[in-house]
C-alpha cells in the first residue's frame, strides 16, 4: 500500500501550521521543507478528512498556495489558489485517477464506451475525468498564472509534460516535479 496524505505548499513569514486556514489540522502537520524565501512544504498524512481551502490559505498569506492529495502513491489531486488568479483543481497521473474515480477519459475511450455512457445517463456514470478536474492544457495555463503571482516566469510546456505524465514510480515524484516546474522548489 502506498502513501495517502496531503502535501501543502505555501509562502509565509510564519510557519503555515500557525495559520488560521490550517487550524483544523494543525496538530497533524509535519514540516518537510522551509526555505529562506518563505516557501514551505508541510505534510498531513491521512486517507480521509479535509485540510481546508487553499483559497483561504492564499488570502491569509497573500501568496499562492497549493496542496497535493496523494492517493496510494498512484495519483494526486492538485488544488491551487492565488490571491489574484483564484483557485483551480487538476490531477497528476490521470489514468490512475480515472481508475479511482471510476471516470473515463475522453481521449482514451472507444466509440462504443462513450455512446454507452451517454445513453446510460446517471446509472452508466457518463462522467469523464475532465468533469472533475481541469484538462492538462487548461491546468498548465492556470499554473503559469499561479507561478507569475509567486514571482516566477514559467512556460506551459514543462508543466504540461508533468500534467500528462504517469508516476515514475510514485505520484509524489510528479508532485515535486510540478513544484520544480513552477519555480517554487527546484529539484
Name what the model sees in each region.
Residues 94-108, 116-187:
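Long, compositionally biased intrinsically disordered terminal regions
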Residues 25-96:
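Short, intrinsically disordered low-complexity segments
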Residues 1-36:
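Short, extreme N-terminal segment that most often corresponds to the first beta-strand
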Residues 20-24, 56-59, 145, 161, ...:
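Charged/polar, solvent-exposed surface patches and flexible loops
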Residues 1-4, 42, 67, 174:
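Intrinsically disordered, low-complexity segments enriched in small/polar residues
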Residues 10-13, 88, 96-99:
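Surface-exposed, low-hydrophobicity interaction/linker segments
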